[in-house]
Amino acid sequence: MSILSAILQGILQGLTEFLPVSSSGHLSLYQYFTGINSESSVTFSVMLHLGTLLAVIIAFRGPVWQLLREFFLLFADLFRGRLFKQKATPYRRMLYLLILSCVPLLLVLPLQDLITSVSADNDILVEGICFLITSALLFLADRAPRGHRDASTMKGKHALAIGVAQLFATLPGISRSGSTISVGQLCGLERSYAVSYSFILGLPAVLAAGILDLHDAATAGIGIEWGTALIGMAAALIFGLLAIRLVNYLIKSDKFRIFAIYTLVLGSVVVILGIVEKITCLLYTSDAADDLIGVD
């Protein structure tokens, strides 16, 4: 892989990871149209995701630090027998909710082979349909009334709903940020809180997925070009920070609908291309079969 390709994929990952348009879907399309090897592209995609993970840690370093602090204090309170004897702080409550949102991701392990096969195949029809699902969620969230819930008023059922949305976002074309922010808004979360909750929720998911994929790649003997991977990761980090600032601005200024329109148009085009490709493939197969019969 060239350095230019690594930079372009890093920029694409950094922008689309946080903009509600599906980074995995865009990377899948990029790799499909450029013909990049599917196995090596999976490990390279992991490195790009680690770059965006660092972007979240930097952008939300205050809340992330407080949540880490509460995580260790939680164990201290557990050993001292006072875990439920005092009122939870807002960050302790947010920590509980984030843990609850991660529970649906346990289903990823038995479904990992299916998800990987969909992500690495040469059929873009699935990506197109998933882009349309993202668009539908964004349109629904755009029409939802403004919510006012935060960590102090958010309920467990809301956390689970957001977690289920994140589970489905493992499919390429369904935006993780778009689906979790949209479901958060539909659950009545305040918009800026929905954004921060969504991005922070992605930290354990991205980290766990990265560790699993790198382990599988190492076990299978799939190599990775560390030089280009680190360059791509740096590009993803820089443009990820820019994208986070843009998302915060757009959601506060009621301009999120632009992404619903974008994913609707993109999804429609990809679905049409996918259908045309399937029809062409069927016709080619049919002609090849006729020629073979003629030869015989």
Model regions: which residues?
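Membrane helix-loop-helix hairpins that form the core translocation module of multi-pass transporters
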Residues: Y32-R143, G210-D213, A243
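Hydrophobic alpha-helical transmembrane segments in multi-pass integral membrane proteins
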Residues: L167-I174, V269-I279
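Small-residue-enriched transmembrane helix starts and helix-helix packing motifs
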Residues: M1-E17, F131-S135, A151-L167
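Hydrophobic alpha-helical transmembrane segments
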Residues: I7, L95-I99, G128-L132, L160, ...
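Conserved small/polar residues in nucleotide/adenosyl-binding loops
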Residues: Y284-D291
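Interfacial segments of multi-pass membrane proteins
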Residues: S5-Q13, H26-F44, A165-F168, S179-L201
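Interfacial loop-to-transmembrane junctions
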Residues: L241-V265
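Membrane-interface helix termini and inter-helical loops of multi-pass transporters
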Residues: Q112-D121, H215-E225, I279-L283
